[in-house]
Amino acid sequence: MQKSEGFRSKTRYKLQKHPRQKGMAPLTRALKCYTEGDLVHVVLDPSVQKGMPHPKFHGKTGVVVAQRGSSFLVRVKDGGKYKDIIARPQHLRESKL
């Protein structure tokens, strides 16, 4: 039988929440606005499936390039290339740097 290679495959621990963080995230996280040039970390929230970037970008840091509706276009370095990913604000955290 062929092995399944879905969007969330091999994410058993990556898309798991700790017991104290279970449930929905605060509403302010969904309403967060970023401006062009902001440094953001891609931190996937498994309780929100909409606007979730591919799990391989979890933990990466990128620059906000533009806003697409309620989502943001983030430029992330993947290997030697820059890739643009579209993510909702629930999956982004502002960098402290």
Swiss-Prot record:
Residues 1-24 are annotated as: Disordered. Belongs to the eukaryotic ribosomal protein eL21 family. GO terms for molecular function: structural constituent of ribosome. One of its GO terms (cellular component) is ribonucleoprotein complex. It comes from Methanococcus maripaludis (strain DSM 14266 / JCM 13030 / NBRC 101832 / S2 / LL). GO terms for biological process: translation. PANTHER family: 60S RIBOSOMAL PROTEIN L21. InterPro entries: Ribosomal_eL21, Ribosomal_eL21_arc, Ribosomal_eL21_CS, Ribosomal_eL21_sf, Translation_prot_SH3-like_sf. Residues 9-21 have a biased composition (Basic residues). Keywords: Ribonucleoprotein, Ribosomal protein. It holds the Pfam family Ribosomal_L21e. This is Large ribosomal subunit protein eL21.
